Regions:
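Trp/Gly-enriched beta-strand/coil motifs that build multi-repeat beta-propeller-like domains
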Residues: 2-283
Length: 283
């Protein structure tokens, strides 16, 4: 396979990646079961890119655990971000965005060739696929630059996005930002952010593109024990959005969603005993 390294891989790589993720979901029955319940949390499974550029995916088993990994592709080097996106609100990923370290961002869907949707994105130190966050037609992207300014790109539903909208500032206080789904049961997608002292905060979504999130509320402290927080959609197939967290030892924990803003996550559950620090990106 052609290496990515800031440029797009060929159609074969795109097709293989989509097929591998779909196959992993179908093999567990997850795709069909979840597709019958539209309007719940996204069912994306969990995928990762390791330091060598190999990409793997894990399907949810329905109890919070994950299947054995399936290799998607190789040569995924030079990437700063990969994010899955659901563009038609059926809770299944339709495609993915990939941002190269050179600042070019592409969209991939099915057998279609890669679509370049932007450039100059190396100005951002964080990019998050947040789902339908600002009332757009498709999934949106949230970004943060080195100054701490936050921008929202509304999705058109075909992988392309609008011009950016500045929706916040001062977010350089956070070391992790995650979100792709509804955490409080109001039907609007939310965000979580961890500050430098290890406190995790909830930003409830409003659905308003000009002010897409409400004032933050505290979830809890001690979250600096993790080096990666990622919102992978619904991993235990209960219809609620979950969070995965990895620590320095390479252990992976599931924080299952509750749908309650006052306590949006259940107690952590160990779902990966070791080896998860091989991944430098989750998507």
């Amino acid at each position: 396979m052609a290496k990515i390294s800031g440029r797009r891989p060929g159609r074969a790589a795109t097709r293989l990646a989509a097929a591998a993720i779909t196959a992993a979901l179908v093999a567990t029955g997850a795709s069909a079961a979840f597709a019958a319940e539209p309007g719940d949390a996204p069912l994306f499974g969990l995928s990762g890119v390791d330091a060598s550029g190999n990409a793997y995916t894990y399907a949810p088993q329905g109890d919070g655990t994950l299947s054995a990994r399936v290799k998607i592709d190789s040569g995924w080097t030079g990437l700063a971000f990969v994010g899955q996106v659901d563009n038609n609100a059926d809770n299944i990923a339709d495609g993915r965005w990939q941002l190269g370290t050179a600042g070019n961002i592409y969209y991939y869907e099915g057998n279609s060739p890669a679509k370049k949707i932007g450039y100059g994105w190396d100005t951002y130190n964080t990019v998050v696929s947040v789902g339908q966050f600002g009332g757009g037609e498709g999934g949106d992207l949230l970004t943060r630059d080195d100054k701490g300014d936050v921008y929202l790109y509304l999705g058109y539903g075909d992988g392309t996005v609008t011009k950016r909208l500045k929706v916040g500032y001062g977010w350089d206080i956070y070391t992790q930002i995650a979100g792709n789904g509804d955490l409080d049961g109001d039907g609007k997608n939310d965000l979580v952010a961890r500050d430098k002292s290890g406190v995790l905060w909830l930003y409830k979504g409003t659905g308003d593109q000009k002010a897409p999130y409400a004032k933050r509320t505290k979830i809890g402290s001690g979250w600096n024990q993790y080096n990666n927080l990622f919102a992978a959609g619904d991993l235990n197939m209960d219809g609620r959005t979950d969070l995965v967290a990895r620590n320095e030892k390479g252990e992976l924990y599931l924080y299952a969603g509750t749908g309650n803003a006052a306590a949006p996550y259940k107690a952590k559950a160990l779902i990966g005993t070791s080896g998860w620090n091989t991944y430098r990106l989750f998507f």
